[in-house]
Amino acid sequence: AVEKVRHVGDLVACVAAVDEATAMEALNLFEVEYEVLEPVFDPKKGLEDADEPIHWRGKYHLARTNVQKRVFQEFGDRSLVETPLASSHGKWNMAGVHHGFTEPHAVVAHWDPNGRLQLYTPQQVPHYTHRALATVLDVPMHQINVIRTFVGGGFGGKSDPFPHEMCAAILARKSGRPVRITFDREEVYWINRGRHPSHIEVKMTADEEARISGFDIDALIDGGGFASFGHVTSYYNGVLATAPYELGSFHYTGARVWTNKPASGAMRGHGAVNTRCAVEVGLDEMSEQMKVDPIDLRLANLLPPH
C-alpha cells in the first residue's frame, strides 16, 4: 500500500531475514499510524458518491463513486418481449468464493552474477508477471527470467502479478541473496482474487413458439480493493450469459464496484458462473409455465451450426 490501505490485510511493508522467527521479530518493531476512513463494504453503497473514493483516477473517474467499470450491451428487437407467453424474473445474491488451492502463494527470487533476475513462482500468468517486474524494477525485460514452477492448484487464483513477487525481487536485489516468500493460509485469503460476490437480476421471456424472445440482465459485482481481472469480469457477466442460445433480444447492464475487502478476480468459469446459474434457473421456470420439457426448450433455442 502507498499512502492508503484499501482493506484489512493489504500489504504495507516487507522484511527479509535469515529465518522466519527473526523476520517476525523485525515486523513487530514497525509502528504504523492510520487515519481511519469510512469503509465501503456493500457494493450498493459503492454506487453512491463518496467523500474519499477507494481509488481516484482523475478525469477518468466516474463522478465521485467507487465504480470501477460500467458495461452496457444490447442487440435484437426489444419489441419482442412485450407480449410473452412465458416469463421469469429472478434476483440473486451470490457470495464470493475462494479457489481453495492446496499450494499457497510462494516465490523465490535471486539476481545472478550477470545482473539478471531469476524469479521462480507457481504463476498462471508468467508473462504478465514478467512485464510487471520490468515496470516495477525499471529493468529491461531481457534481464528478467520468470520461471513458472509446477502450479499446485490455481483455478484462476494465481493469475495476477502479485506484490509479494515484486517484494521478493526487490529484497533479493537489496540483500544480494536469494529471497523466499511463502504465504500461510490466512495470507492467501487476504490476497484472495476469488469469484466476485454479485447481485444479479435476470428477466427473460419466451413467445408462443417457445422461442426465447429476450434476456434482460443487470449485474452488480463486488470487486474488493483492487482491479485484478475486474474489467473483463464486468464484460463476461454479459457476453457469456447468452451461452449457446439464439435470442430475439438481449440487454445487459453491469457495474464493478471497489469495496474495502480483499480483491476479487478470476475463478473457474470466470465471469460466467453467476449469471449462467440465474439464466438456467429462469429457463427452467419458463419451461414449467409452458409445460414443455426443459431440455427440449433448450434444444429448440440453440444457435444454428456455423
PLM regions: where:
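Alpha-helical support elements that line or immediately flank enzyme active sites
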Residues: 12-34, 106-175, 231-242, 266-301
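General beta-strand structural signal in soluble alpha/beta enzymes
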Residues: 7, 88-92, 119-121, 143-148, ...
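Short, surface-exposed loop/turn segments at secondary-structure boundaries that line and modulate
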Residues: 1-10, 44-48, 52-59, 128, ...
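Short beta-strand elements
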Residues: 106-111, 199-208, 214-219, 245, ...
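FAD-binding glycine-rich core of flavoenzymes that anchor FAD
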Residues: 97, 170-188
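Extended, polar/acidic
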Residues: 1-132, 230, 235-249, 260, ...
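Short, well-ordered strand-loop elements centered on a beta-strand within folded domains, enriched
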Residues: 115-122, 209-219, 256-257
